[in-house]
């Protein structure tokens, strides 16, 4: 064990991680999870359904935040086979703009999927008449180092990132001046957020192909990245995450890869304080990243949401486990692309609770599903508990 630790230290301190194995060579195993069929209970008013459920975050096994891009009016009469979500009647929730109603955008459910809070006071904030391009909430997270457990929201309608009090009563902070832009005061379609122990916030700024950093008070600190496919360049950075030693992982979706960075005072790259230390190629559409103290999990789709809406997905989403050097450890696929239990068109965001249940948001079919470990599942094939745990 001591010898392995010494080798790892040398690799990291040299500024580059070991080259990962080819992702396509990774064996695809059987999912170690069972779906909880019908977990998320409908609560919309009569004639309405869940909309594009783009985001999920489990604060605890009994308190799970969900965000959707508005609800949808159901056809009248409702087609046979409706199971409480639009995908069950062949409607793509993320593109059915004509039936969208901006209500119940953020809500909270318990461990059995029952709605316990609806933050309707903020619905108007995210309203959009756009029928093309992004709108509404893209992802939600809680900073694990924040004892107040504020809910952070990537708002693509207003091109801002917001922090709400945990009970939803107060808007605590907003990053970005509002409206799309490319200077240090603006985002162009923020997609994700990640955090450091000192309260720093990283934001993936999709339209500007960059990562922006802010301090705990929301002041701009720095930025890096331009559109491209070179080292430290991005094409639609969809996910950003940090691990327990402060490394920064970026799901570079348009370039089909994950890039890894660290903060340093000895960077020889063009940025004086940020250094690219690894590129992990071989993905198709890395949409979300979950880093623990031991490994990194990545959700990899065969299509993004627009392509999935056009029926261009060629395989179900895949969960990929890598070690800290980017070496593939294990992977398994979601049950299918359909609307059956455990299936989904797109795995957009996922979250893991302290009991190692995981939750997956599918904005195309318009539902969030809960999965629990199969009896006897190996810890090598399942998610570790959040590390660091929420304060």
Regions found by a protein language model. Name each.
Residues 22-391:
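Eukaryotic scaffold repeat domains enriched in small/polar residues
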